[in-house]
Amino acid sequence: MTATVVIGSQWGDEGKGKIIDFLGQSADVTVRYSGGDNAGHSLVVNDQKLALRLIPSGILAPNSICIIGNGTVINPATLLDEIKELNGVGVNTDHLKISDRAHIVFPYHILQDQQQERDRSKNGEKIGTTNKGIGPAYMDKMQRIGIRAIDLLDNETLEEKIAFNLEQKKRILDEDLWNQLPSLKELTAQYIEYGEILKDYITDTSYLIHTNLNDNKRVLFEGAQGTMLDIDHGTYPFVTSSNPTAGGAATGAGIGVTKIKHVIGVCKSYVSRVGEGPFPTEQINEVGDRIREIAHEYGTVTKRPRRIGWFDGVLMKYVSEVNGLTDLVVNCLDVLSGFKELKICTGYQTDHGVIKYYPASEKELKNSTPIYETLPGWDEDLTQMTTYEELPANAKNYLKKIEEITGVPVSAFSIGPDREQTIVLNDMWSD
């Protein structure tokens, strides 16, 4: 029995999909446990690049079970589009399963999201939401008025719950947004149809996961986004509405924490971020522009240019502790080729002195000045290398410095976007 969790160790977009695809070839079950269609991951199928938002990366492994867990919020329209797109390139989705406890996104959630962001913008407090309705869907979940996947299979219950929710939203939504909503009859008919199409996918996925763990199967949990977007542990309020951290795998999939053997943190050799919020090591200069263009740093879902910064060791130490990381995977090492010098942040200079921890205060983060350790770079092209031994000495030292700061071994690193460009140093499936 092996349960392995893969989490993003920065602000998302760390390349988790590639690593999950790589590890997923040996997994019997792959589980997405948090978030919704606000989080995108890219996969390559038959030389075609696909951008998935809901379906786990493990869908490409035909002999494994692919699960969307109870901790997610699902927009059925997006999900069906993804199923259609995958089928169109020859990927069978019959092994996809959806938790009957997962909550469902409705059009009123999306409109509520737009209204909230519009109101925040008036006060200069824009968060940078993707306007996919994720936050409002989680709000309804916490207020205990949400509609779950299981409700899509009971027409009478579904209509009653939609009617109740529409009454609530009419009190909340501005008139111009309220008028964009379908009628109760239209909305109910649409979601009954979704239920008919998805009924064979919807099941008790927690039971399914436990059955496989008890049969000594390998279960891979894939987190969306990243630790620094976690509702509890991220750079609040510039965060998502769920828990993409390792702890979220237990609640978002319905398993006990003692079942988890490995927690793999995926990070880049530098840092990127989409949207608003503090970013101590951000490089709004030639360095940031250069990395962005080399690595094509634009959001999978939003297409927005990502903000770029030097590797933040303070952040990574915090992330390793919050998640209990057992392994690190460092992506995009090849992107740093050609830099004469590389910098790693080892502390923050604040108004109160030097700190080595990641502060909760947004104000303190914004006013922090990173303290850097400078390392020599390398000129060699890494993309054709196949072993750790081939790396130039300075690239090896860069990885060793990351291990030293985090206290977590680098078990794999990538030197390009393809699965074959992942070099594994330690077994991340061992019992």
Swiss-Prot record:
Q: Does the keyword GTP-binding apply?
A: yes
Quaternary structure and interacting proteins, as annotated: Homodimer.
- An individual GO BP term: 'de novo' AMP biosynthetic process
Q: Which Gene3D superfamilies match?
A: Adenylosuccinate Synthetase, subunit A, domain 1, Adenylosuccinate Synthetase, subunit A, domain 2, Adenylosuccinate Synthetase, subunit A, domain 3
The positions flagged as active site in the entry are: D13 (proton acceptor), H41 (proton donor)
Q: Which SUPFAM superfamilies has this protein been placed in? A: P-loop containing nucleoside triphosphate hydrolases
HAMAP family, sorted: Adenylosucc_synth (MF_00011)
The protein in question is named Adenylosuccinate synthetase
**What EC class does the entry list?**
ligase
Q: Which residues bind IMP?
A: D13, E14, G15, K16, N38, A39, G40, H41, T130, R144, Q225, T240, R304
Stated role: Plays an important role in the de novo pathway of purine nucleotide biosynthesis. Catalyzes the first committed step in the biosynthesis of AMP from IMP.
Identify the main location. cytoplasm
